[in-house]
């Protein structure tokens, strides 16, 4: 397609800023269990394969899960800008941090919800949400569109917004694909086929946004 896509699999390195959810048979801290860094990376690598298969040029902020691969957020946005990406994805999953358990996708872009810093960020974020919510393998506790500006979502940050988006000049946003502390979803996110579905929906969103030829084969979930 000639497109240039930059993928940032969020977090990295099984470190203190990572997110570990202990579910049987994995103990807390077991790197074979659920860690957001691993899950994000798997999705990113599969998305890269899908996009490159369609002729896109793809750069990633990391391709391994080591401490040294967890780049500074300013470095990530600078790399995406210098790469002259047509689209930037920061891939994450979410958590409530409380005893409340919910599960739905959420898209965050720079600016106010009704006044994005870059209007195209919101356009493509809405497209991705539409595709992610099509996933019927999981259970969504709500299906209404959740696409919000980070200045509204973090009102106490004085319009600082998310670090990875702060200095981003190319079109892009951060996605929270689902809630990894919703235990059924935790188990699903340990399954490579399930993570592939999310990557597939990212690729579909790219195809729709850029109005490029779609895939010639489907994916049966």
What residue ranges belong to the model's regions?
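Active-site histidine-acidic residue metal-binding/catalytic motifs
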Residues: 1-79, 83, 103, 108-111, ...
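Solvent-exposed loop/turn segments at secondary-structure junctions
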Residues: 11-15, 36, 64-69, 93-99, ...
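Stable alpha-helical elements in mature extracytoplasmic
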Residues: 36-39, 43, 47, 60, ...
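Sec-exported extracytoplasmic/periplasmic mature domains
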Residues: 45-56, 81-85, 93, 129-138, ...
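Active-site-adjacent mobile loop/cap segments within catalytic or ligand-binding domains
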Residues: 90, 94-98, 144-220
């Amino acid at each position: 397609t000639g497109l240039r896509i930059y993928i940032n699999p969020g977090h990295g390195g099984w470190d203190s800023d990572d997110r570990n959810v202990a579910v049987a048979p994995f103990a807390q801290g077991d790197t074979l269990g659920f860690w957001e860094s691993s899950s994000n990376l798997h999705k990113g690598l599969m998305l890269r394969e899908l996009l490159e298969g369609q002729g896109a040029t793809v750069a990633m902020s990391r391709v391994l899960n080591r401490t040294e691969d967890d780049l500074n957020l300013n470095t990530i946005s600078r790399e995406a800008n210098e790469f002259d990406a047509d689209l930037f994805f920061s891939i994450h999953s979410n958590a409530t941090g409380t005893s409340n358990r919910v599960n739905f996708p959420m898209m965050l872009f720079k600016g106010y919800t009704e006044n994005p810093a870059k209007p195209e960020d919101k356009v493509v974020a809405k497209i991705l949400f539409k595709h992610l919510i099509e996933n019927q393998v999981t259970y969504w506790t709500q299906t209404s569109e959740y696409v919000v500006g980070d200045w509204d979502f973090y009102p106490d940050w004085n319009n600082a917004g998310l670090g990875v988006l702060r200095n981003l000049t190319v079109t892009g946003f951060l996605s929270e694909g689902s809630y990894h502390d919703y235990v059924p979803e935790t188990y699903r996110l340990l399954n490579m086929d399930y993570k592939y579905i999310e990557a597939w929906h990212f690729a579909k969103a790219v195809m729709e946004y850029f109005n490029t030829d779609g895939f010639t084969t489907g994916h049966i979930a």
